[in-house]
Amino acid sequence: MFLKFFFAFLTMLASTQLFAQYDVPLYTSYTTEAARAKMNERLIKNSITKNLLLPLSDSTEENWEDAFDAMEVMNYHAPFVQSKVEAAFDSIGVRSVSFQRALMELAYANYPGKFIMQTNVLLEETTDPKIFAVCAEYLLQHKKTDAEKQILSKKLLEKFTDTAYKNPVLFMLSTRLKSADVNQQPVHEVLKDIVSKNFLPGQIVMYSFQRKNRDYPGMVLIRNADGNFVRDSSGNLFHLPQLARSISNLPGYLRNGNTPQGIFKMFGFGVSMSNFIGPTANVQMGMPVELSIQKFFDDSTILDSAWTIGWYQKLIPKKLQSYLPLYDSYYAGLAGRSEIIAHGTTIEPDYYAGKPYFPLTPTQGCLCTKEIWNGKRLESDQQKLVNGLLEAGGANGYCVVIEIDDKQAPVAIKDLLPYLKN
């Protein structure tokens, strides 16, 4: 698949000594202006137009899915492709689950509110939990009222009965359909505890503070194993903008959705061979269930191999264990999400000109920092992040992603200072 190919990464773990020497000029032939122009031409001509000219059938579904992927990445709109998307929706009920998922993801990303009638029909007909969830999210994207949530909650329980609470995807959907007061604890109280030295004591922690609206960049800070936040040479808190938005902007429990909130294991640096991620070192991360219990806790003496929520709760202070957003990464892992890392970018930022996060670029759900390339690497917040982690002692520890509020603006260091007095 298109996105799998371009965002796939090669996990090459390396020593701290290697990456201490890694801050050197880099060159990538595929980020020159000429190479990007050729790439755009190939994507439109081959990945999109050529694939969508094929008659839609069981044997060509994958070609159409590749086109949908390319349209998402490029934020591509044209009358020709819209007519093909409309044609695809005409037969969505008889298409494979994979095709339905890809088409609904494209609709969520590129055509919000345009296929409400067709989505309602698919919602009624499908028996697949993930398709039901993405249909529900598409409808909520258009009309996020209490009345709409009640209608969808009723349909969820009628269709899936008791299994709605046992399936991780349906469970997470059900929490999103509840009233806004589902989280009893005010987030400002949660933040104070999460940044304290008593949270994940003795561990290096990379914090990614985000807005609820992931169109706005968040901010990454690093705490060393002694519980102190990393500072720069001037004595100021080390901080960088970091985007936790996926291309689709779907919620984090769904495939290719935004970075889930919660706790991730960090287990070293890696280098990607992807033409969209680039060669700057990335931070390898994993979620509960995706990683074994032994690896997530970095403890080979653990004999249990069956993940339960009780294991995950061992990392969460008792007073925070009722704060549901901290469990997003657990349920995302349980639902099958994987390969969420913290990386730089070599994707063409102009695809997203005019977006609140420009010139940062969205991903398939990873944490992403700004990099500017034109053959040479001109700017790299990702390299600064790597250096900050090295200053803290390396990339072995945990990453915590948490939303702080719904302010319609990028996260600024002044938003975080009240919680960081340690």
Where do the PLM segments sit?
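Cell wall/extracellular polymer interaction/catalysis modules
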Residues: 22-76, 80-86, 90-101, 105-109, ...
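A short acidic, amphipathic alpha-helical/loop segment
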Residues: 118-122
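Bacterial Sec-dependent N-terminal signal peptides
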Residues: 1-22
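Cyclophilin-type peptidyl-prolyl cis-trans isomerase
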Residues: 356-375
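Amphipathic alpha-helical protein-interaction segments enriched in hydrophobic
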Residues: 132-133
